[in-house]
């Protein structure tokens, strides 16, 4: 293996690379690194690189058993936000589609939104550290 870098990469299968790029750049402040649409593009936010692979990309080719990679599911990237209520309000006003409402647990608050292909993005606001 190569040495780890500062950048972390995650691949998402998408139905439409251009729609996916528009979603991540418009709603979540990612920046385009490269685009070979309609097959592939990659976008970045901080040290997260998201590889967006369409049906015509090499990552979209069927496996030897015939299984085709598909978008969607429940695996997701997890983005930390400072004020989840304000972020959700901003995104709802902009038309971002959410799967649920804000949930709160001992670790903090979270909500799920989805990109145009159904891939999930989790927004998470950590709980305040307990006072000792």
Task: Please report, for each region that a protein language model flagged, where it lies by residue.
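Conserved active-site tyrosine of GNAT-family acetyltransferases
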Residues: 20-25, 91, 118
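Catalytic core of Fe(II)/2-oxoglutarate
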Residues: 13
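Short glycine-/small-residue motifs
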Residues: 120-123
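Vicinal oxygen chelate
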Residues: 1-9, 31-80, 88-114, 125-132
């Amino acid at each position: 293996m190569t040495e780890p870098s500062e950048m972390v990469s995650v691949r998402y299968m998408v139905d439409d690379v251009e729609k996916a790029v528009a979603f991540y750049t418009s709603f979540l402040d990612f920046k385009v690194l490269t685009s070979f649409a309609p097959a592939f593009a990659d976008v970045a936010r901080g040290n997260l690189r998201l590889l967006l692979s369409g049906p015509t990309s090499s990552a979209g080719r069927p496996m030897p058993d015939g299984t085709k990679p598909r978008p969607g599911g429940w695996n997701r990237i997890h983005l930390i936000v400072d004020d989840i209520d304000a972020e959700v309000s901003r995104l709802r006003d902009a038309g971002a589609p959410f799967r649920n409402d804000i949930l709160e647990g001992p670790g903090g608050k979270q909500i799920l939104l989805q990109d145009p292909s159904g891939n999930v993005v989790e927004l998470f606001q950590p709980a305040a550290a307990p006072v000792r």
